[in-house]
Curated annotation (Swiss-Prot):
Gene: Cox18
Source organism (scientific name): Mus musculus
Subunit structure of this chain's protein: Found in a complex with TMEM177, COA6, MT-CO2/COX2, COX20, SCO1 and SCO2. Interacts transiently with MT-CO2/COX2 during its maturation. Interacts with COX20 in a MT-CO2/COX2-dependent manner.
Primary role: Mitochondrial membrane insertase required for the translocation of the C-terminus of cytochrome c oxidase subunit II (MT-CO2/COX2) across the mitochondrial inner membrane. Plays a role in MT-CO2/COX2 maturation following the COX20-mediated stabilization of newly synthesized MT-CO2/COX2 protein and before the action of the metallochaperones SCO1/2. Essential for the assembly and stability of the mitochondrial respiratory chain complex IV (also known as cytochrome c oxidase).
Chain segments annotated as transmembrane: 165-185, 221-241, 260-280
PANTHER family, per database record: CYTOCHROME C OXIDASE ASSEMBLY PROTEIN COX18, MITOCHONDRIAL, OXA1
Domain of life from the UniProt record: Eukaryota
Record-given protein name: Cytochrome c oxidase assembly protein COX18, mitochondrial
Residues in the signal sequence: none
Gene Ontology annotations for the cellular component aspect, listed alphabetically: mitochondrial inner membrane; mitochondrion
Membrane topology of the entry: Multi-pass membrane protein
Transit peptide: 1-63
Assigned keywords, A-Z: Membrane, Mitochondrion, Mitochondrion inner membrane, Transit peptide, Transmembrane, Transmembrane helix
Amino acid sequence: MLCRSCAGWLRSLPTLRLPAPGSPPAWSSARLPALPVWAAASVSAASPGGWYEALAASAPVRTAEEVLLGAQEATGLPWWSNIILSTVALRGAVTLPLAAYQHYILAKVENLQPEIKDIAKRLNQEVAVCARQFGWSKRVARLTYLKNMRRLISELYVRDNCHPFKATVLVWVQLPMWVFISVALRNLSTGATHSDGISVQEQLAAGGTLWFPDLTAVDSTWILPVSVGVVNLLIVEIFALQKIGTSRFQMYVTNFVRAVSVLMIPVAATVPSALVLYWLCSSLMGLAQNLLLRSPGFRQLCRIPPSKSDSETPYRDLSAAFCAKFLSRKR
């Protein structure tokens, strides 16, 4: 009788919707001496049919080249301006809406946590009753609890249409776009592109500004590479500051991303300045996007549901957390 009541209670729980978590390019050596010998060799050393050569000649990379060339022809701006403008346009039109959608999903998932905790508490009590009545072992009771808990959480995600996997759409779009544009810029910088690749390479060689007049050469001052690393580290730290009670796995991931951000500095010092300029602009847009999505007004504009972790003064809180974490250690 008690077991039937337990089963009936489990079925009567509200239906929740929860988620379970072409021809190879003709490489030109006309401007390769501007790069370190080993870095240039890494581009031209790709044997016919190699993975990099296949990527460099792929349709998405060719499309990225056409977008960059089309933007340059349409605006008539120098290449350094064209790279910045194209980056801002793509990040604003593609990744910003996806980032807002990501925050929308995460806010709904966060708002479900009190209900999930309540269900977990009740389910644990019912499983304990059944375990005593039927003599279940701890292992059987635990497996029964986990199985039903996963089902109930999945139903919650379905009910509110907020499966956490939907929050990963941004990564699946942003990362490939970053790779394709990076390879496209490298093709243009080394002349490894269409029949007019050499002329585009010459335009890039004269299309820089300030301390990097030649976009096909590396930045010998290391200003651009170091800036990329610093901005990426700043993004990581801002993300880490908003996490309270992070798990060990999250700490490992955060430290890994920190290491990648630092390693990007020497890598950026060995590739054409056109790529590094794009990386820097993309990172700056990512930083601005991160800060913008903290604004209560912008979140309301995007119809992101209010959540417990929201703040009326996000920038003041961020500044205070940053000072407490880094500046207080020096005193």
